Amino acid sequence: MIRENVVIDMQNGVFANPRFDREGRVVRINQLIDHADQVIFIQHAEDEMTQGSELWQILPELHYPQKAISVTKTACDSFYQTPLDTVIAQLGATHLTICGCATDYCVDTTIKIAASKGYALTIASDAHTTADRQYVTAQQLIAQHNEVWAELSIPGHRITVKTTQQILADWLD
Protein backbone atom coordinates (compact mmCIF):
# COMPACT_ATOMS: atom_id res chain seq x y z
CA MET A 1 0.00 0.00 0.00
CA ILE A 2 1.27 3.45 -0.92
CA ARG A 3 1.33 5.71 2.13
CA GLU A 4 -0.31 8.74 0.58
CA ASN A 5 -0.72 11.87 2.70
CA VAL A 6 -2.99 14.70 1.56
CA VAL A 7 -2.34 17.94 3.46
CA ILE A 8 -5.11 20.49 2.99
CA ASP A 9 -4.73 24.29 3.19
CA MET A 10 -1.90 24.53 5.71
CA GLN A 11 -1.03 27.96 4.33
CA ASN A 12 0.10 31.34 5.63
CA GLY A 13 -3.15 33.03 4.59
CA VAL A 14 -5.36 30.40 6.20
CA PHE A 15 -3.45 30.79 9.46
CA ALA A 16 -3.55 34.61 9.36
CA ASN A 17 -6.44 34.07 11.79
CA PRO A 18 -5.80 31.88 14.85
CA ARG A 19 -6.46 28.15 14.45
CA PHE A 20 -6.77 25.65 17.28
CA ASP A 21 -3.49 23.99 18.37
CA ARG A 22 -1.42 25.20 15.42
CA GLU A 23 1.86 24.00 16.94
CA GLY A 24 0.57 20.53 17.86
CA ARG A 25 -1.14 20.06 14.50
CA VAL A 26 2.03 21.05 12.65
CA VAL A 27 4.11 18.58 14.69
CA ARG A 28 1.72 15.72 13.92
CA ILE A 29 1.35 16.65 10.24
CA ASN A 30 5.14 16.73 9.95
CA GLN A 31 5.27 13.22 11.43
CA LEU A 32 2.84 12.04 8.74
CA ILE A 33 4.78 13.87 6.02
CA ASP A 34 8.06 12.34 7.18
CA HIS A 35 6.70 8.78 6.99
CA ALA A 36 4.54 9.06 3.87
CA ASP A 37 5.62 7.62 0.54
CA GLN A 38 4.05 10.59 -1.21
CA VAL A 39 2.66 13.93 -0.03
CA ILE A 40 0.14 16.06 -1.87
CA PHE A 41 -0.26 19.61 -0.61
CA ILE A 42 -3.62 21.14 -1.44
CA GLN A 43 -3.38 24.94 -1.59
CA HIS A 44 -6.36 27.26 -1.72
CA ALA A 45 -6.12 30.26 -4.06
CA GLU A 46 -8.70 33.00 -3.60
CA ASP A 47 -8.78 36.77 -3.05
CA GLU A 48 -5.48 37.82 -1.40
CA MET A 49 -4.24 34.22 -1.47
CA THR A 50 -3.37 34.28 -5.16
CA GLN A 51 -1.27 31.42 -6.44
CA GLY A 52 2.40 32.09 -5.74
CA SER A 53 1.77 34.86 -3.18
CA GLU A 54 3.19 34.79 0.35
CA LEU A 55 -0.29 34.10 1.78
CA TRP A 56 -0.69 31.12 -0.59
CA GLN A 57 2.58 29.53 0.56
CA ILE A 58 2.67 26.47 2.84
CA LEU A 59 3.42 27.25 6.50
CA PRO A 60 7.19 27.57 6.84
CA GLU A 61 7.35 25.13 9.76
CA LEU A 62 5.87 22.30 7.69
CA HIS A 63 8.27 19.86 6.07
CA TYR A 64 8.12 19.92 2.28
CA PRO A 65 9.68 16.81 0.71
CA GLN A 66 11.41 17.26 -2.64
CA LYS A 67 8.96 14.91 -4.35
CA ALA A 68 5.88 16.56 -2.83
CA ILE A 69 3.15 17.57 -5.24
CA SER A 70 1.13 20.77 -4.98
CA VAL A 71 -2.45 21.05 -6.23
CA THR A 72 -4.12 24.46 -6.28
CA LYS A 73 -7.86 24.70 -5.70
CA THR A 74 -10.41 27.51 -5.62
CA ALA A 75 -13.25 25.75 -3.79
CA CYS A 76 -13.69 23.79 -0.55
CA ASP A 77 -13.66 20.61 -2.64
CA SER A 78 -10.04 19.70 -3.44
CA PHE A 79 -11.24 17.73 -6.49
CA TYR A 80 -13.38 20.48 -8.05
CA GLN A 81 -11.73 21.66 -11.30
CA THR A 82 -8.29 20.42 -10.15
CA PRO A 83 -6.02 17.62 -11.39
CA LEU A 84 -6.18 15.83 -8.01
CA ASP A 85 -7.92 12.69 -9.35
CA THR A 86 -5.35 12.43 -12.14
CA VAL A 87 -2.43 12.97 -9.76
CA ILE A 88 -3.69 10.25 -7.41
CA ALA A 89 -4.25 7.85 -10.33
CA GLN A 90 -0.74 8.48 -11.69
CA LEU A 91 0.66 7.65 -8.25
CA GLY A 92 -1.34 4.42 -8.16
CA ALA A 93 -2.91 5.29 -4.82
CA THR A 94 -6.33 4.05 -3.73
CA HIS A 95 -6.01 4.93 -0.05
CA LEU A 96 -5.50 8.47 1.22
CA THR A 97 -4.58 9.80 4.65
CA ILE A 98 -6.11 13.24 5.18
CA CYS A 99 -5.05 16.09 7.46
CA GLY A 100 -5.02 19.90 7.40
CA CYS A 101 -7.32 22.91 7.72
CA ALA A 102 -10.18 23.84 7.98
CA THR A 103 -11.96 20.89 9.54
CA ASP A 104 -15.47 22.21 8.92
CA TYR A 105 -14.91 23.46 5.38
CA CYS A 106 -12.19 22.17 3.05
CA VAL A 107 -11.20 19.08 5.03
CA ASP A 108 -14.80 17.92 5.48
CA THR A 109 -15.78 18.59 1.87
CA THR A 110 -12.69 16.86 0.49
CA ILE A 111 -13.23 13.80 2.70
CA LYS A 112 -16.83 13.38 1.59
CA ILE A 113 -16.03 13.87 -2.09
CA ALA A 114 -13.03 11.50 -1.91
CA ALA A 115 -15.18 8.84 -0.25
CA SER A 116 -17.89 9.23 -2.89
CA LYS A 117 -15.20 8.80 -5.57
CA GLY A 118 -14.27 5.44 -4.06
CA TYR A 119 -11.06 6.21 -2.21
CA ALA A 120 -10.40 4.41 1.06
CA LEU A 121 -9.63 7.10 3.63
CA THR A 122 -7.86 7.43 6.92
CA ILE A 123 -8.43 10.69 8.76
CA ALA A 124 -5.78 11.83 11.22
CA SER A 125 -8.10 12.79 14.08
CA ASP A 126 -5.50 14.96 15.80
CA ALA A 127 -3.95 16.49 12.67
CA HIS A 128 -6.72 18.71 11.35
CA THR A 129 -7.81 22.03 12.75
CA THR A 130 -10.10 25.01 12.41
CA ALA A 131 -11.03 28.24 14.16
CA ASP A 132 -13.64 28.95 16.79
CA ARG A 133 -16.97 29.84 15.18
CA GLN A 134 -19.75 32.05 16.50
CA TYR A 135 -21.67 29.26 18.25
CA VAL A 136 -19.11 26.49 18.68
CA THR A 137 -15.43 26.11 19.58
CA ALA A 138 -12.81 24.67 17.27
CA GLN A 139 -12.33 21.74 19.66
CA GLN A 140 -16.04 20.93 19.49
CA LEU A 141 -16.04 21.13 15.69
CA ILE A 142 -13.02 18.84 15.46
CA ALA A 143 -14.56 16.27 17.82
CA GLN A 144 -17.91 16.40 16.05
CA HIS A 145 -16.37 15.97 12.60
CA ASN A 146 -14.23 13.04 13.78
CA GLU A 147 -17.42 11.38 15.02
CA VAL A 148 -19.34 12.10 11.81
CA TRP A 149 -16.54 10.82 9.56
CA ALA A 150 -16.20 7.64 11.60
CA GLU A 151 -19.92 6.96 11.14
CA LEU A 152 -20.28 8.18 7.54
CA SER A 153 -22.18 5.64 5.47
CA ILE A 154 -20.81 5.23 1.97
CA PRO A 155 -21.22 1.52 1.12
CA GLY A 156 -18.00 -0.07 -0.05
CA HIS A 157 -15.88 2.97 0.77
CA ARG A 158 -14.07 2.76 4.05
CA ILE A 159 -13.35 5.79 6.22
CA THR A 160 -11.21 5.22 9.29
CA VAL A 161 -10.51 7.87 11.91
CA LYS A 162 -7.27 7.34 13.84
CA THR A 163 -4.74 9.35 15.79
CA THR A 164 -1.43 10.22 14.15
CA GLN A 165 0.35 7.69 16.37
CA GLN A 166 -2.09 4.94 15.34
CA ILE A 167 -1.56 5.79 11.67
CA LEU A 168 2.22 5.76 12.06
CA ALA A 169 2.06 2.41 13.88
CA ASP A 170 0.03 0.99 10.96
CA TRP A 171 2.47 2.42 8.42
CA LEU A 172 5.49 1.04 10.23
CA ASP A 173 3.92 -2.38 10.79
Name the predicted role of every residue range.
Residues 1-2, 12:
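Extreme N-terminal tail/first-helix region
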Residues 2-4, 28-31, 38, 49-173:
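Active-site-adjacent betaalpha module
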Residues 8, 42, 125:
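Active-site flanking residues adjacent to catalytic metal/cofactor-binding acidic residues
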Residues 11-17:
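Short acidic, Gly/Ser-rich segments with clustered Asp/Glu that frequently serve as metal-coordination loops
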Residues 18-45:
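A short alpha/beta connector and helix-capping loop motif
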